[in-house]
């Protein structure tokens, strides 16, 4: 079960991802698999193009990650999205 802080960070990431995608089509991809507590974010800074990988990718397996490790990864994602939002 995800704790409150993790849920808040995930919601912040979703919000930032939607804001960035409203300016740049197909830039941020976010996936949460609740049945196995996996959260994935991929960012294509210059937009998605077939055959090109993401510039930034993070996946978190909450079931096997320590709380501090998960928070660190979530904070890295938030920082990256906030930079994209400003630019």
Question: How should these model regions be labeled?
Answer:
Residues 1-38, 47-87:
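Negatively charged, low-complexity tracts enriched in Asp/Glu with abundant Ser/Thr
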């Amino acid at each position: 079960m995800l704790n409150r802080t993790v849920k808040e960070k995930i919601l912040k990431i979703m919000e930032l991802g939607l804001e960035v995608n409203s300016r740049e089509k197909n830039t941020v991809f976010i996936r949460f698999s609740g049945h196995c507590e996996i959260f994935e974010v991929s960012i294509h800074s210059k937009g998605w193009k077939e055959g090109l990988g993401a510039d930034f990718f993070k996946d978190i397996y909450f079931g096997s990650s320590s709380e501090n490790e998960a928070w660190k990864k979530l904070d890295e994602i938030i920082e990256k999205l906030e930079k994209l939002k400003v630019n």
